[in-house]
Amino acid sequence: MLDNLKKYKIVLGSQSPRRKELLSGLDIRFEQKAMPDIAEDYPAGLDPEKVPLYLARMKAEAYRSKGMMQDSTLLITADTVVIVDGAILGKPQDREEAARMLRTLSGRTHQVVTGVCISHRWETRAFSCSSLVTFAHLSDEEIDYYLERYRPYDKAGSYGIQEWIGYIAIQRVEGSFYNVMGLPVHLLYNELKDFGESN
């Protein structure tokens, strides 16, 4: 599948092992490269649902500005945020903040949005995906256990749906499960397929 993409050097511009795992599931050859250091800042007042797409575009531009885009490069960048009460929960700075985030999510439904950019030369295709996740109530003991064993400090909202906490606490997911992991691969597949056919 996706034979039309064989002429491209596909690069996943992300350090995330989860995104690497998910992209591998599409059975395409790609290289994973760490992104140039960028501040994940966004304009004040920007709609929270638009933030991940904004950041995915910023990552692509950072990659391009460093001269890391060759003519054959097809770059995939992404960013995921957790939104609750209209506020973004990013990656926690420390254990205390992670615990506070999990207590906020406990017993409630929150939104997970991932923005994705596919960049080639000066063309960029961008899209986003939204899922709703409902958590059961989490006890302090469960939160402490999860933070001690899994240390989710590299994850938006302080949790990984594919980890222990996902098994014991997630009651319902409306939308893409893989989007919550960090990459809506069903949409990405269709975009890559369309890109390969039109270029």
UniProtKB/Swiss-Prot annotation:
The record marks 18, 80, 162 as: Important for substrate specificity. Its main location: cytoplasm. The keyword Hydrolase applies. Its cofactor is a divalent metal cation. Pfam families: Maf (PF02545). Coiled coil: none annotated. This is dTTP/UTP pyrophosphatase. It comes from Porphyromonas gingivalis (strain ATCC 33277 / DSM 20709 / CIP 103683 / JCM 12257 / NCTC 11834 / 2561). The lineage of its organism: Bacteria, Pseudomonadati, Bacteroidota, Bacteroidia, Bacteroidales.
